Amino acid sequence: MGILLAVPEIIAASVAGGAEALSIAGSGAAIATGEGLAALGGLTESAALLGETVEISEAAATVLTKVPELVTVTQGVTAAVQGGAGLVGGIYTALAADRPGDLPASTPTGSPSGLHPPAGYNPQGGGLNIQSIHKPLHAPYPGMALAPIPEYNLETGIPGVPDWVFNFIASHLPELPSLQDVFNRIAYGIWTSYYNTGRTVVNRAVSEELQRLLGDLEYGFRTALATIGESDPVNAIVEQVRSFVSGGRQRELLQIAAGQPVDISEGVSRGTATISNAVEAVRDATQRLSQATYNFVYDASTLPRDGFNALSDGVHRLGQWISMPGATGGTPHYAAPDWILYVLEELNSDISKIPTQGIKRKLQQNGLHSKASLHSKTRKVTKKSTHKSAKPSKTSQKRRGRRAGRRTTVRRNRV
């Protein structure tokens, strides 16, 4: 699924959670990107990264308990490291104290947070199925609301950080350096410092670079999430797609007015070429927007409908195939969140075909009857002028005579 099917769900869940939930998700995003540095600095505890404890009020705990999608999204944002420690573990630990029934008793306890299986667990042995995004995803325990998101083979080469995090940073925070650039800079600093002066300068360079990275990410994500909290994500998606469709309509109208046939295959081939060149589209900002919009329209139009799309208590895994228990065992179903269905309804209410024959006929009529309309206007003006110069009628003459007689009578009485 494209970035528009992943990021707006995070935005919608964070907005629904309130201001405090947004602040929690913001620090979780900063911690998530910092956990990718575990191979360099040995950072395994999320609390040690910020040096503070997570305090959750009763209102925020209620929001997070009633909206399990927000907990799942926060877990995806943090992208917990292999040890299983992370901000989501701290959030769930605080929530489990108030709601101990949320976590099944048979949950594996191989990690401090209880969200990851113990060491030696075979992912392919009937438990967590690390496969492609469109294949069934089986949870290691019955609690689907707490099933961890698998760690896929990422194109960027940084384990534990999903692809949409880099796309989100590149699209919303263009002024920040990319994580790959920061990693290359750290590696180059380690090599040159060790070659020149030794271990002291190495530690100093790594520490300064890590602190700078964490500070930039924390500030950037706080700013981005604060802006997101004041927006309406669903209507923003609808307006984006409508502007995309209206641009195509305007282009077709110009072609029809010029007498050129509308080439539909050109748009299809252009979209296919954009998908095949996804790497180049990410590098170019303009092509990235077109690619994201095309991916959203294509994915939304090909959603299967089987009665399980509007799951209120289930988990949709950001638009993935999930396995739900049933009478015949685990059956995979495609679960789409409610905001996708709302967007589809809004889009279908405004999309219609262009009346090509009606437009041509209207243009021809305007060209033929222009002289006739001008002639009718001159006739109206002539009638008005002749009406003013005509002689007064007999009735008006009688009225004037009566008024003159009354005036003479009044004058005689005064005398």
Curated annotation (Swiss-Prot):
Residues 102-121, 365-415 are annotated as: Disordered. Changing D284H: In strain: Isolate S5. Residues 358-409 are annotated as: DNA-binding. Keywords: Capsid protein, DNA-binding, Host endoplasmic reticulum, Host membrane, Host nucleus, Late protein, Lipoprotein, Membrane, Myristate, Viral penetration into host nucleus, Virion, Virus entry into host cell. GO terms for cellular component: host cell; host cell endoplasmic reticulum membrane; host cell nucleus; membrane; viral capsid. Residues 318-353 are annotated as: D1. One of its GO terms (biological process) is viral penetration into host nucleus. This is Minor capsid protein VP2. The lineage of its organism: Viruses, Monodnaviria, Shotokuvirae, Cossaviricota, Papovaviricetes.
